Amino acid sequence: MLENIQRSWFEHYMVPCFSPAKFIPVRAKGSKVWDQDGKEYIDFAGGIAVNSLGHAHPELKDELIYQIDKIWHIGNGYTNEPVLKLAKRLVENTFADKAFFCNSGAEANEAALKLARKYAADKYGKNKNEIISFKDSFHGRTLFTVTVGGQPKYSQDYAPLPQEITHLPYNNLSAIREHISENTCAVIVEPIIGEGGVIPADPAFLQELRTLCDRFQALLIFDEIQTGVGRTGYLYAYQEYGVEPDILTSAKGLGGGFPIGAMLTKQHIAAVFQPGTHGTTFGGNPLATAVANKVLSIVNQAELLTGVLQRHDYFMDKLSKLNQRYQIFSCLRGKGLLLGAELDKAWQGKAKQLTNLAAEEGLIALIAGPDVLRFAPALNIEFADIDEGLVRLESAIMRFVG
């Protein structure tokens, strides 16, 4: 007999660090989700930019089933075939020489920051330890990464915090020029600030970061947890900007819904991570890396990446026309299928209210702070699903504006 699982169990049994929707999704296919009552939703969230190829993609499912019958976990005392294949694929398709695998974006950023600190200490001495990040950025929930992130609301309750971390204004050339010094070991930046408002970097800003890091012997880290794996219409966003980092972090869409994180870097930097300096129990496990291999084999095709750019134009055109009718958004921005719609002054602070109404109308969407709706659908979302999702968003907006 099937157990009747209730939404109220969340409050009864689970630590309350999340505030989930009142419905429970139980089934999904492509860009559609169904809850316990059979209600259908169009998914414009993609599990927060995770479900890069939608839900239950048949090729990912087949790959996982194939690997399940072979080997699940062996531990880091051994390597395995899927992880070696994935490392080779990433190295051959990016700037990197070496790859490290873990389980999440936070772990990937933790590894990147530790690597940068150790590289600087080994090469230049322990006084070269400052990490520069940017206001409104988000890099994870570990104590190190949450402190490096530029949103104090996430770190203020956990003092004492890691030290020698500086937060500067994003897209501000003068601020970084004035502050960076010989004591800076790394600069970490999101090519598009995601959680903090969907704000793309100015090309000149990223180019200047590269120049300054070279001048002061600091490492440039691109956090591509959210922008990577085709999200912007390129395999990684750095490729569009034409700015090569020293370290890149990837997660979310890399596993297409299966947990995985990766840190990519150059040979001379990776060399400081000798056995025992860093590690992971589950990172690089055969199941996750098998699925990630299949994701990359599908995403890194010209047809799919071109399709992301086409969907960007289509989505933004439809969203702009919707906004002309209601004048609710002051700004539409983003790249590829990482899009933000900032509420006009009269509606600021109410993004969550609007996404709640959207859910009632059968649309799953995200927020990026109190004022911004964020959309990160599957890279292969059907155009008909974009149309239907925006119809449902319009229904929510009609209720929202009263």
UniProtKB/Swiss-Prot annotation:
General function of this protein: Catalyzes the transamination of N(2)-succinylornithine and alpha-ketoglutarate into N(2)-succinylglutamate semialdehyde and glutamate. Can also act as an acetylornithine aminotransferase.
Pathway: Amino-acid degradation; L-arginine degradation via AST pathway; L-glutamate and succinate from L-arginine: step 3/5
GO annotation terms (biological process): alpha-amino acid biosynthetic process; arginine catabolic process to glutamate; arginine catabolic process to succinate; ornithine catabolic process
InterPro entries: Ac/SucOrn_transaminase_bac, AcOrn/SuccOrn_fam, Aminotrans_3, Aminotrans_3_PPA_site, Class-III_PLP-dep_AT, PyrdxlP-dep_Trfase, PyrdxlP-dep_Trfase_major, PyrdxlP-dep_Trfase_small
Residue positions, PTM N6-(pyridoxal phosphate)lysine: K252
EC number: 2.6.1.81
Residue runs in coiled coils: none
Name the UniProt record assigns to this protein: Succinylornithine transaminase
Species in which this protein is naturally found: Photorhabdus laumondii subsp. laumondii (strain DSM 15139 / CIP 105565 / TT01)
Catalytic activity from the UniProt record: N(2)-succinyl-L-ornithine + 2-oxoglutarate = N-succinyl-L-glutamate 5-semialdehyde + L-glutamate
